[in-house]
């Protein structure tokens, strides 16, 4: 994955990423893929806790910011401060805002301006890119 110009605090070689991640996690997080909607075990997670990056362990979102968007992917209205960064994604003939981990640069999903108030953001995140730790 070389679409991000900066170096991240956590880096691994491609071989190390392949060893650390499952094939599906690698495809989503390192090759900018998308998991099938409705297939994520974290989609219906309602316990209080924290969602973290599978690639590096950085906390990304809390369950207090999660909401049901009806899209089939875990959705949040705000990330933890400094946890994610965004870039413009021009793939598939669309212009979207990609969300990636600010610590390791792994692709997480996209953010859209159609979420609930007050932020009106919908961070649509691939569940395979996250771990959940109950509070």
Where would I find each of the regions flagged by the language model?
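A short Gly-Trp-Pro
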Residues: 4, 8-135
């Amino acid at each position: 994955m070389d679409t991000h110009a900066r170096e991240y605090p956590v880096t691994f070689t491609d071989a190390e990423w392949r060893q650390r991640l499952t094939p599906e996690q690698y495809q989503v997080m390192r090759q900018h893929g998308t998991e099938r909607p409705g297939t994520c075990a974290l989609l219906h997670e309602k316990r209080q806790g924290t969602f973290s990056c599978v690639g590096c362990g950085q906390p990304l979102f809390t369950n207090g910011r999660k909401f049901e968007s009806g899209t089939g992917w875990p959705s949040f209205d705000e990330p933890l401060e400094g946890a994610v960064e965004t870039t413009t994604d021009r793939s598939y003939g669309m212009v979207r805002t990609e969300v990636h981990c600010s610590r390791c640069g792994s692709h997480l999903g996209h953010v859209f301006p159609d979420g609930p108030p007050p932020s009106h953001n919908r961070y649509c995140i691939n569940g395979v890119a996250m771990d959940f730790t109950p509070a």
